[in-house]
């Protein structure tokens, strides 16, 4: 029986799939941290005492004390949260 090109390609694809699965399972089972975590660079999220709701016009009620509204999907009730930490959002304005 002759070893043809189609059989060779099928074996090559099979070996590539097995190799890829082996690499994926090895990295997925890793318990180590990919980067050192520092409390200096962390962000702390806290729930505020108030909730926020969507008004009939589609606008949300304001959160106070440095908090902002977070809601899920099409929910009309959300929670006010506050972020505290070392974070820097990119700005579209030119910095001087």
Swiss-Prot record:
Glycan-linked positions: 51, 74
Compartment(s) where it occurs, according to its Swiss-Prot or TrEMBL record: Secreted
Keywords annotated in UniProt: Disulfide bond, Glycoprotein, Secreted, Signal
The keyword Secreted is assigned to this record: yes
Disulfides per UniProt: 48-67, 52-69, 63-80
Any one Gene Ontology cellular component term annotated for this protein: extracellular region
GO molecular function, one term: C-X-C chemokine binding
Signal peptide span: 1-28
Principal cellular location given in the protein's record: secreted
Protein function: Salivary chemokine-binding protein which binds to host chemokines CXCL1, CXCL2, CXCL3, CXCL5, CXCL6, CXCL11 and CXCL13.
Protein name per its UniProtKB record: Evasin P1078
Lineage: Eukaryota, Metazoa, Ecdysozoa, Arthropoda, Chelicerata
């Amino acid at each position: 029986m002759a070893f043809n090109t189609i059989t060779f390609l099928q074996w090559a694809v099979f070996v590539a799939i097995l190799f890829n699965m082996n690499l994926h399972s090895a990295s997925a089972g890793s318990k180590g941290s990919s980067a050192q975590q520092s409390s200096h660079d962390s962000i702390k999220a806290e729930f505020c005492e108030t909730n926020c709701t969507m008004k009939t016009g589609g606008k949300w009620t304001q959160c106070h004390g440095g908090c902002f509204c977070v809601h899920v999907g099409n929910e009309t009730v959300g929670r006010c949260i506050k972020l505290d930490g070392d974070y820097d959002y990119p700005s579209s304005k030119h910095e001087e």
